[in-house]
Amino acid sequence: MSVAVLAFGLNHTSAPVSVRERVSMPVDLVKPALEGLRATFGGAVREAAILSTCNRTELYCAAEGQVAEHLPAWLAEHNRLEAAALRPHLYRHQHDDAVRHAFRVASGLDSMVLGEPQILGQMKDAVRAANEAGALGTLLHQLFQRTFSVAKEVRSQTAIGAHSVSMAATAVRLAERVFGQLEDARTLFIGAGEMIELCATHFAAQRPRSMVVANRTIERAETLAGRFSAQTMKLADLTERLAEFDVIVSCTASSLPILGLGMVERATRQRRHRPMVMIDLAVPRDIEPEVGRLDDVYLYSVDDLGRLVQSGTDARRAAVVQAEAIIETRVQGFMHWMQSREVVPVIRDLHQAADDVRAAELERARRMLARGESPEAVLEQLAHGLTQKYLHGPLAALNRSEGDERRQLLAWVPRLFPGRDSRR
């Protein structure tokens, strides 16, 4: 059965964070998930990769056609969810649509922040994880290599990433809405990954009163804090120290909330109801959503920031048209490569058949020479034998055919045997 490229999953436009966090896969769970996927479908899934970020969880597969119908059930079962509840949020792309989707994702056209560059690195990490899991083959390897090339071309030839309003910059603006200038604000960053580093960079530019980094691994917190002359603290100290901070930005890989309603409620009482801005960029969420109901807390999720970011994308809309044109050209190029792969086995078989004929006729010629026959007669017989053997198949097909089939075969003769006019 033929193998098709398939892209399947959900993202920030198809599913709210409450759904995305339930199918999000930390890096250490990607390999077991790929193994489970291939074990479930056996040889029907030839190759696979999983891209899981705050804004999307997607599967890219080289698979037989019937696999697509069963992927929603697999994803639901893998995450212990009801398929009926998950299905409305899922999308599926096949063939050139799947290739187009991969190119758009890597180029930042499908991102919550139009043109944001982080997604390309995240996709490269996903490909690396799939390769380490032994789940990549020729087709997906070629797809992703072309995907990275297209993303680079789009960014170098268009203004898609120019003046990008980042999530980190938006987080600063939200804090400024509540506190005005941030010179007196005490800021806490929970986590030490790329997003926290970006946020810390933007907040540091506003010269807040203090910056503290809390992380499960204190060494990573110290490395990040050292860049901004910030302090560090242990996650275990959050309960006692949370009330100190005016702005909290959190983005960890925790599968469970770090800040619960009770903890934050106690902190607001200790602060005598001075406001707190809490920005949760994690998926799954680090802060229980019920915290947003507290009068003195301004809680923003990654989806809230995404909606605010969209207002800053108008200046880049013109670049989208140019980017889409580049992508469309490259999609057609990839599909041509895929189609050319289909004839490779046929070409290989033709070469083998021709080589078998050559070897047989050559051996016959050697025997004739060994019997003392003249070289001229041997060459004549060799040429005649090769001609007869090579033409036997086409001539037999023509003789057996009739009607439309014969007309089609006759039309192909000049293309298969160029240099001679067809005589009918």
From Swiss-Prot:
Residues engaged in binding NADP(+): G191, A192, G193, E194, M195, I196
InterPro entries documented for this protein: 4pyrrol_synth_GluRdtase (IPR000343), 4pyrrol_synth_GluRdtase_dimer (IPR015896), 4pyrrol_synth_GluRdtase_N (IPR015895), GluRdtase_CS (IPR018214), GluRdtase_dimer_dom_sf (IPR036453), GluRdtase_N_sf (IPR036343), NAD(P)-bd_dom_sf (IPR036291), Shikm_DH/Glu-tRNA_Rdtase (IPR006151)
Pfam families: GlutR_dimer (PF00745), GlutR_N (PF05201), Shikimate_DH (PF01488)
Site residues, Important for activity: H101
Keywords per UniProt: NADP, Oxidoreductase, Porphyrin biosynthesis
Catalytic activity: (S)-4-amino-5-oxopentanoate + tRNA(Glu) + NADP(+) = L-glutamyl-tRNA(Glu) + NADPH + H(+)
Annotated EC: 1.2.1.70
Binding locations of substrate: T53, C54, N55, R56, S111, E116, P117, Q118, Q122
Highest taxon in the source lineage: Bacteria
Active site, per annotation: C54
Pathway: Porphyrin-containing compound metabolism; protoporphyrin-IX biosynthesis; 5-aminolevulinate from L-glutamyl-tRNA(Glu): step 1/2
GO molecular function, one term: NADP binding
Record-level GO BP terms: protoporphyrinogen IX biosynthetic process from glutamate
Function: Catalyzes the NADPH-dependent reduction of glutamyl-tRNA(Glu) to glutamate 1-semialdehyde (GSA).
HAMAP family: Glu_tRNA_reductase (MF_00087)
Note, other: During catalysis, the active site Cys acts as a nucleophile attacking the alpha-carbonyl group of tRNA-bound glutamate with the formation of a thioester intermediate between enzyme and glutamate, and the concomitant release of tRNA(Glu). The thioester intermediate is finally reduced by direct hydride transfer from NADPH, to form the product GSA.
Subunit structure and binding partners: Homodimer.
Free-text comment on this protein's domains from its UniProt entry: Possesses an unusual extended V-shaped dimeric structure with each monomer consisting of three distinct domains arranged along a curved 'spinal' alpha-helix. The N-terminal catalytic domain specifically recognizes the glutamate moiety of the substrate. The second domain is the NADPH-binding domain, and the third C-terminal domain is responsible for dimerization.
Family the entry assigns: Belongs to the glutamyl-tRNA reductase family.
UniProt protein name: Glutamyl-tRNA reductase
Organism: Bordetella pertussis (strain Tohama I / ATCC BAA-589 / NCTC 13251)
Source lineage: Bacteria, Pseudomonadati, Pseudomonadota, Betaproteobacteria, Burkholderiales
